Amino acid sequence: MMISDLPHDLESEILSRVPAKSLAKWKTTCKRWYALFRDPSFVKKNFDKAGGREMIVLMNSRVYSNSVNLQGINNRFDPSMEVTGKLIKLNDSKGVDISAIFHCDGLILCTTTESTGLVVWNPCTGEIRCIKPRIFYRCNDRYALGYGNSKSSCHSYKILRSCCYYVDQNLSLMAAEFEIYDFSTDSWRDLGDITRDMIVYSSGVSLKGNTYWVSGSKEKGFFMRYFDFSKEVFGRLPLPYQSFNANHTAALSAVGNEKIAVLQQKILAMSDEMRIWVTNKIDEAKDLSWSNFLLTVDYGKFNLPCLVNVTSFLLDEENKVAVCSDVDTKDGLRSRIYIVGKDFYKEVFKDTRGSDNNWPLLLCYVPSLVSIQENIPNKAEENEIKGG
């Protein structure tokens, strides 16, 4: 019996367990599969069952895919990393330089270095959507990609643009701009000055459609700021450390689909210590709580030539190690990636050149079939799709 002879429900269940990258190659096999792989309920089921995660990194205005092998690390086997290729095809064809990336639901939001536009890209399907500004982009804009809850199985994807800036020479008066781009209407909406408490100390991370940052002030201390894309409002959550100190730096990272990790350093106080905490499963109906120190690293014991200032990280809870990125200030500002644990440090990658503006960013990426274009096949796909 062939899979095409199975009842459609059983066929759909079997295919939902196949990696999205393989399904993307099969989408033109027949009309039925093409329609199935674009069905929002099937796309969500396939994404929820996804086991494989990949790592991507932004370096030197380019986005690369990486492969990190941590197997056997607790048995003293050396981990390794391979830069497997450049991802963004725009880099080669149009010379587009990327200044920031943001991952949500298998989609990558790219900001160009000249602030000329936004590009939303699905690496799995190859779909690209260019977003034009409502009026213009500012060089200090921040962008986040998320989605609101919908009665249908299809997520309602949105982009948040936020910009806070001073309007006087004394730096005492601050203005703020907030806009939402809605994929379903292909348009921007002005949210007004909904908050001016938007000074953030970390890159944003997406979890369950919402975006989280580390924020803080002398009056309020450090806290976790989040934006709810369903209600289109900001909220606050506690961090495991509350006091505000300008010597502290922080980074956030999503841990699977349920938790967030925060990394803290006292880098400007010349401290070699790094601490990482992890939340419980984030649920709007429950209070947020944090683990005790999941991982505390004293970089001093590794006799490194300079202080480590982590710009981004990915946490492996099982092995209690973190894959971190930073810039080696003693070696031409070259980006480096290393794996670190309580008693373990291994550099697995160093860039061949440095740059004053080169701050590497690591992201955990999950391939997805989600479509960001109109549900109409292009001419090339129409010609490829077989009958049935």
Swiss-Prot record:
Keywords for this entry?
A: Kelch repeat, Repeat
Q: Which Pfam families match?
A: F-box, FBA_1
Against InterPro entries, the record matches this protein to:
F-box-assoc_dom_typ1, F-box-assoc_interact_dom, F-box-like_dom_sf, F-box_dom, Gal_Oxase/kelch_b-propeller, SCF_F-box_component
Q: Check the record and name the CDD domains matching this protein.
A: F-box_AtFBW1-like
Q: Please tell me whether the keyword DNA repair is annotated for this protein.
A: no
The Kelch repeat boundaries are 163-208, 336-383
Protein's UniProt name: F-box/kelch-repeat protein At3g17530
Task: Look up and give the organism this protein is from.
Answer: Arabidopsis thaliana (Mouse-ear cress)
